[in-house]
């Protein structure tokens, strides 16, 4: 099915990046030269705070989503030019503030006061 998006003599174009924390850092375009390749995006979120994004071309892309104790992994595949543009926000502001509150408490009052 992925090959249907390709016309003879053309290649699929996908955004490409490795382990970026912002979708804005994933603007490099990769030329997928093998017939049947798809664009993919992987988002790995650790404890709701930090999201790492990777993108590129793949012959064996499979949509996948897994929840782990410390985070979540999500892989999406698509087969049209630059279809893997969307990413995830690198840091959720409210979650970051909530996560930093205990550390701030330790700095201000010390470990014995918490």
UniProtKB/Swiss-Prot annotation:
Disulfide bonds: 14-39, 17-26, 32-57, 61-77, 78-83
PANTHER family hit by this protein: PROSTATE STEM CELL ANTIGEN, UPAR/LY6 DOMAIN-CONTAINING PROTEIN
Protein name as catalogued: Prostate stem cell antigen
Gene Ontology terms: biological process: acetylcholine receptor signaling pathway; negative regulation of ERK1 and ERK2 cascade; regulation of neurotransmitter receptor activity
Compartment list: Cell membrane
Domain of life the protein comes from: Eukaryota
Gene3D superfamilies: CD59
Assembly notes: Interacts with CHRNA4.
Tissue expression profile of the protein: Highly expressed in prostate (basal, secretory and neuroendocrine epithelium cells). Also found in bladder (transitional epithelium), placenta (trophoblasts), stomach (neuroendocrine cells), colon (neuroendocrine cells) and kidney (collecting ducts). Overexpressed in prostate cancers and expression is correlated with tumor stage, grade and androgen-independence. Highly expressed in prostate cancer bone metastases. Expressed in gastric epithelial cells, mainly in the isthmus (at protein level). Not detected in normal intestinal epithelium (at protein level).
Propeptide: 86-114
Gene Ontology molecular function: any one: acetylcholine receptor binding
The UPAR/Ly6 domain, residue ranges: 12-86
Pfam family, one: Toxin_TOLIP
Membrane association type: Lipid-anchor; GPI-anchor
Organism the protein comes from: Homo sapiens
Lipid tethering residues (GPI-anchor amidated serine): 86
GO CC terms of this entry: extracellular exosome; extracellular region; plasma membrane; side of membrane; synapse
């Amino acid at each position: 099915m992925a090959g249907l998006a390709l016309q003879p003599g053309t290649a699929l174009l996908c955004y490409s990046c490795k382990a970026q924390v912002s979708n804005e850092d994933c603007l490099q375009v990769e030329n997928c030269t093998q017939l049947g390749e798809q664009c993919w995006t992987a988002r790995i979120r650790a404890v709701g705070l930090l999201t790492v994004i990777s993108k590129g071309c793949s012959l064996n892309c499979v949509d996948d989503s897994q929840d782990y104790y410390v985070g979540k992994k999500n892989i999406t595949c698509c087969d049209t030019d630059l279809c893997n543009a969307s990413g995830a926000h690198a840091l959720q502001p409210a979650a970051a503030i909530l996560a930093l509150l205990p550390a701030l408490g330790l700095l201000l009052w010390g470990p014995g006061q918490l």
